[in-house]
């Protein structure tokens, strides 16, 4: 058999088992652990003189109806919280992932994976020198402006979870869409936006009826926020309805400790599943020791990207953010004290360490309300790199690569938010049967700027050159909406998630919705143990005077980095 060098093979088909890929300008390196394409020398490849030709890699007679793929991504490196770091062909049909393995024509190729047959119905993406991830999910979004969708897609985020009705003061501070009329208007509005949505209703009600009517009107979950009163009674009432209707509850706790301390809020949870937003506390919540929630097995903790990674300017920018978002007045001493109580350098530094240990399970943005929606994926990878430089290799990492650490951070922005919201059976990972929301990255731009964003198996967003040019690549190159973002294709490639109650009551027909509408499920049985690669339950102590954080008795701190990877090299501003 003819042999070629490893370098020549990588030039032709991309890296394979044992090869390492540097992620951007970071110090993170992933190593391909497994090659799912069975054997070498029979690779499927698109192009002139390549193998994806009729009678060669392309099967002659199989129709799409009979199982021929719609799209194949060839020879791509997959980085996925469930699959690991693997080399594979990835097949897509009818907007769903068929599987990973070896694609092609079983009449001419050995070892073609069942279901991954290519033919006349199949188009191709050459993944040889690209990285494939699941589309990201931002679990903490204030729906302040519809243009947020453009920022999200430009960083590989394909699902938004939050609430609001636009740039009103309530939405500037709280991620809820309050009441049936507002929910209906938002469900109608997002029909034209090429991204998945889940809308949270206002959970701040000790009365049951206002909560139920929001679920029946299309809310996919609840958010309890201190600006509307995050009291133990409110939390208990909201969780009781959530238990009955199988929806998630997110909570922004009581910064001022007016209705109780962190221990009282934890007691109000009563062991029930709950998602704690910005669990460090700079974004809001019990001061100064909200971090204790990350040690509870029923609590699914996330934090938000403005403090990740903790850099030399992180603390300085937070005060003004808080004043604007929560309608505070710098001339009122109590308002200033409120803002200052949330900004604690020690707990902000500890937040990054706890992420690195897998104790905080998710990262969201807190979009336009202290966070940056277009940087969620970016901040995850930046934090992973900053922590490697500060703390060294993780115990779980194999010698010579950072696979476990990278996969831990990928899980924080893909599968764990999906599981928490009750949509992990539909999105969040690259698994057979899941919706084909996928992101392709050039390794040099990993986590920063994707090459292609697929929604439901069709390209929705891409870095595209001059449409009048002779090639796709001439300048000016910038992100533009693609065909999945137009016409009725948009409605077949993006999902609106709602409660089962709304789904069963025909919310799509009632409101004339044309998008795919799917119910959430399984939210009340999720605990910290279900958080992929991020299930650590430490004992947390916070010194009330110095705010120093101890994790299992050890001071959790690092020096804030003076420079951060994937940063100014990649952006003009």
Swiss-Prot record:
Oligomeric state and partners? Heterotrimer of UreA (gamma), UreB (beta) and UreC (alpha) subunits. Three heterotrimers associate to form the active enzyme.
Supply the source organism's classification. Bacteria, Pseudomonadati, Pseudomonadota, Alphaproteobacteria, Hyphomicrobiales
- For whether the record's keyword set contains Cytoplasm, the answer is yes
**Any coiled-coil ranges, and where?**
none
Q: How is it modified after translation?
A: Carboxylation allows a single lysine to coordinate two nickel ions.
What gene makes this protein?
A: ureC2
Protein name in the entry:
Urease subunit alpha 2
How many cofactors are bound and how?
Binds 2 nickel ions per subunit.
The broad enzyme category this protein falls into is hydrolase
GO CC terms: cytoplasm
UniProt subcellular location: Cytoplasm
What is this protein's function per UniProt?
Disrupting the ure2 operon has no effect on urease activity or pathogen survival in BALB/c mice when administered orally.
Instruction: Cite the Urease domain residue spans from the record.
Output: 135-573
Q: Which cofactor does it need?
A: Ni cation
């Amino acid at each position: 058999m003819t042999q070629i060098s490893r370098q020549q093979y990588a030039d032709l088909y991309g890296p394979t088992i044992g090869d390492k890929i540097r992620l951007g300008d970071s110090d993170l390196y992933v190593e391909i652990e497994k090659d799912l394409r069975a054997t070498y020398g029979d690779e499927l490849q698109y192009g002139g003189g390549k193998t994806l030709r009729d009678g060669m890699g392309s099967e002659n007679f199989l129709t799409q109806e009979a199982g021929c793929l719609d799209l194949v991504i060839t020879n791509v490196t997959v980085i996925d919280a469930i699959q690991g770091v693997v080399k594979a062909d990835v097949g897509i049909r009818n907007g769903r992932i068929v599987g990973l393995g070896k694609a092609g024509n079983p009449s001419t190729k050995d070892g073609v994976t069942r279901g991954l047959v290519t033919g006349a119905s199949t188009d191709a993406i050459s993944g040889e020198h690209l990285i494939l991830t699941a589309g990201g999910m931002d679990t903490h979004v204030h729906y302040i402006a519809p243009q947020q969708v453009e920022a999200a897609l430009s960083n590989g985020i394909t699902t938004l979870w939050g609430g609001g009705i636009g740039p009103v003061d309530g939405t500037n501070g709280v991620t809820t869409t309050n009441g049936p009329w507002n929910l209906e208007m938002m469900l109608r509005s997002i029909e034209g936006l090429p991204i998945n949505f889940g809308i949270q209703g206002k959970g701040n009600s000790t009365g049951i009826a206002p909560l139920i009517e929001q679920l029946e009107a299309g809310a996919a979950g609840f958010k309890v926020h201190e600006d509307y009163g995050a009291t133990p009674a409110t939390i208990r009432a909201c969780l009781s309805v959530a238990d009955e209707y199988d929806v998630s509850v997110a909570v922004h706790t009581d910064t001022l400790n007016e209705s109780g301390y962190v221990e009282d809020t934890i007691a109000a949870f009563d062991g029930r599943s709950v998602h704690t937003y910005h669990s460090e506390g700079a974004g809001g919540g019990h001061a100064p020791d909200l971090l204790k929630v990350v040690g509870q097995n029923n609590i699914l903790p996330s934090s938000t990207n403005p403090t990740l990674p903790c850099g030399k300017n992180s603390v300085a920018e937070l005060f003004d953010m808080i004043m604007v978002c929560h309608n505070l007045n710098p001339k009122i001493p109590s308002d200033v004290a409120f803002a200052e109580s949330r900004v604690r350098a020690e707990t902000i530094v500890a937040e990054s360490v706890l992420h690195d240990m897998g104790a905080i399970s998710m990262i969201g943005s807190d979009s336009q309300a202290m966070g940056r929606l277009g940087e969620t994926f970016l901040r995850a990878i930046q934090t992973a790199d900053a922590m490697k430089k500060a703390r060294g290799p993780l115990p779980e990492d194999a010698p010579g690569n950072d696979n476990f650490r990278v996969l831990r951070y990928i899980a924080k922005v893909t599968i764990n938010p999906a599981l928490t919201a009750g949509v992990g059976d539909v999105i969040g990972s690259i698994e057979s049967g899941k919706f084909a929301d996928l992101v392709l990255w050039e390794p040099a731009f990993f986590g920063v700027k994707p090459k292609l964003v697929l929604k439901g198996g069709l390209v929705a967003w891409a870095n595209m050159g001059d449409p009048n040019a002779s090639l796709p690549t001439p300048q000016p190159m910038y992100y533009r909406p693609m065909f999945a973002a137009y016409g009725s294709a948009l409605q077949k490639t993006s999902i609106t998630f709602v409660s089962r109650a709304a789904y069963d009551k025909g919310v799509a027909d009632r409101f004339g919705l044309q998008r795919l509408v799917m119910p959430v499920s399984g939210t009340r049985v999720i605990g910290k143990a279900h958080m992929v690669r991020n299930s650590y339950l430490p004992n947390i102590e916070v010194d009330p005077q110095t705010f120093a954080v101890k994790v299992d008795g050890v001071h959790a701190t690092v020096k804030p980095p003076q420079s951060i990877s994937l940063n100014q090299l990649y952006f003009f501003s």
